[in-house]
Amino acid sequence: MYKLIINGGIALNGHVKTAGSKNSSLPILFASILANGPITLTNTPHLSDVSTTLRLLMDMGAEFILESDNSLFIDSSNLTNLVAQYNLVKTMRASILALGPMLAKYCKAKISLPGGCAIGSRPVNLHLKALEDLGAFIKVENGYIYATAKKLIGTEIHFDQISVTATENIIMAATLATGITTIYNAAQEPEIVDLINCLIKMGAKISGAGTSIITIEGVDELSGVTYAVCPDRIEAGTYLVAATITGGKITIKNVCYQSMRAILVKLLETGADIKTEKNSITLDMKGKRPKAVNIKTSTYPNFPTDMQAQFTALNAIADGYSTITETIFENRFMHIPELSRMGASLVLEGNTVVCKGVKSLTGAYLMATDLRASASLVLAGLAAIGTTTIERVYHLDRGYEMIEEKLKLLGAQIERVQD
């Protein structure tokens, strides 16, 4: 077990390069099941969730080579074990994304009910109902999803609520289905667009990417390709908040600012100066104390739930009062007690946190609970007076590539040590 030790109060300055998107890499890796040949991915992030996905695919019969330049060669074209075991699935919610591709290509799958961050129920019923609409026979028994199909048949899918992973699963399943599938109330996240772009390059026929209505015309087969994963907008947003909360100036490279408009608007409201270029964002807080900003999470293109915890930490030391409302997950405020231990003035009322900004936080001994909550504690530690120790940082490794090394490049005093 590792922990992070942070000596806070240092303004961050410099340049940092974001990794490829975690939320693009995982579905694209599962999409490799659909291909009749190998896939090469570039800009692949080195994350524990990526490693778990690769172990899961390898357990099914895939082969892969991970290069030092963040390129990944994977051949999932001939799986021999159509079972996603609990010991691998339990740590990662995205493992449900194996279901659609396996059903589409092999007409059967056995998937353990998934795990991942403990931030709400995140039901899989949307996935299962939609797959049944496509012609699958599904039962859930002893913690496993058993799915079979003679052949998936295109149809209209109407999601009762917007779900990123359900949208991705059904898109992948429909690529090899017979006929046309139309998904209504589809999620519009950039990572879904990235998945669709990869599938189209593989030979899929898909229209409507980035809209709420996506149409897929099934094809007989998909081919292997070389594809570059898009930059991680949540990692980029987290480092921009790090500069804002410490009063620093940083430039983020390998970033697509067009996908981050909702985040950038809120950072501008804090008083930060922001300059965007083709592949970079520069934020300058000029040593100022940030202004408090109200946050309400929603589906893309609105403010992302994956940035809520980071902005809660920012508001904790901002000038003024703010509210942070979470509309996506019902249990995504587990960072509140930890921030309060540092001196933050936070009151949780239902799905809203009322925050009165304090001038400074004090370093404390903290316990990470999930991926983005962990990031918020790191941000708070960077801004705090004194030393902050954060336990259970394996949560961070699920979504941030070498976070302490990148923060060191910006001047942070942060170390990873083993218990």
From Swiss-Prot:
Keywords: Cell cycle, Cell division, Cell shape, Cell wall biogenesis/degradation, Cytoplasm, Peptidoglycan synthesis, Pyruvate, Transferase
Positions annotated as active site in the UniProt record: 117
Chain sites annotated for binding UDP-N-acetyl-alpha-D-glucosamine: 93, 306, 328
InterPro entries noted in UniProt: Enolpyruvate_Tfrase_dom (IPR001986), Enolpyruvate_Tfrase_sf (IPR036968), MurA_subfamily (IPR050068), RNA3'P_cycl/enolpyr_Trfase_a/b (IPR013792), UDP_GlcNAc_COvinyl_MurA (IPR005750)
Catalysed transformations (reactions): phosphoenolpyruvate + UDP-N-acetyl-alpha-D-glucosamine = UDP-N-acetyl-3-O-(1-carboxyvinyl)-alpha-D-glucosamine + phosphate
BP GO annotations: cell division; cell wall organization; peptidoglycan biosynthetic process; regulation of cell shape; UDP-N-acetylgalactosamine biosynthetic process
Signal sequence range: none
Modification 2-(S-cysteinyl)pyruvic acid O-phosphothioketal occurs at: 117
Listed pathway(s): Cell wall biogenesis; peptidoglycan biosynthesis
Main location class: cytoplasm
Entry keyword annotation includes Cell cycle: yes
GO molecular function ontology, one term from the record: UDP-N-acetylglucosamine 1-carboxyvinyltransferase activity
Binding, phosphoenolpyruvate: 22-23
Enzyme class: transferase
CDD domains linked to this entry: UdpNAET (cd01555)
GO cellular component, one term: cytoplasm
Subcellular localization(s) per the UniProt record: Cytoplasm
NCBIfam families according to UniProt: murA, PRK09369.1
Family assignment from sequence similarity: Belongs to the EPSP synthase family. MurA subfamily.
Reported function: Cell wall formation. Adds enolpyruvyl to UDP-N-acetylglucosamine.
Protein name: UDP-N-acetylglucosamine 1-carboxyvinyltransferase
Organism this protein belongs to: Ruthia magnifica subsp. Calyptogena magnifica
Gene coding for it: murA
